[in-house]
Amino acid sequence: MKKLLTALMILAAAATLKASTDGYVMLSVFSPGQIPIAATSLNGVRLNALYGECQNLNGLDVGLVGRVRENVNGLQIAAVNSVGTDVVGAQLGLVNFVEADFAGFQFALWNDVGATAKGFQLGLVNRANALEGLQIGLLNFIDDPQQTCRCLPIVNFGW
């Protein structure tokens, strides 16, 4: 009876951990080889050796390649940063991709925002669907036909 009760308590604790979708620290070599799993929303720090993935990130993301399926609020530092929806904060890397809105600062060789970029993009190539801010780079693109300056070298801006 004592062994059964102990086994049930361990099973209940494991189920609680598995059901939790929030984490404070994530360590990753290559997804799915990460703790906790990619479906986790992270409120803290993620360290990626090669590739890490999570649902949402509020905090710091450091590594080689970082993928966030939904939203980022914080700082991403990686060779490649990729976000499925919105970013509020900063991205520092070689390549930064944001599929929806971005608000903050991007620094990379290539910065790409799928919707509106609000803030500052500094890179070799900068692209945004719409821009409320400043782009500084060799090539700067704004896809929105409403913008006055859609493609400019060195400096581009939109309001």
Go through each PLM region and give its residues.
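Sec-dependent N-terminal signal peptides
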Residues: 4-13
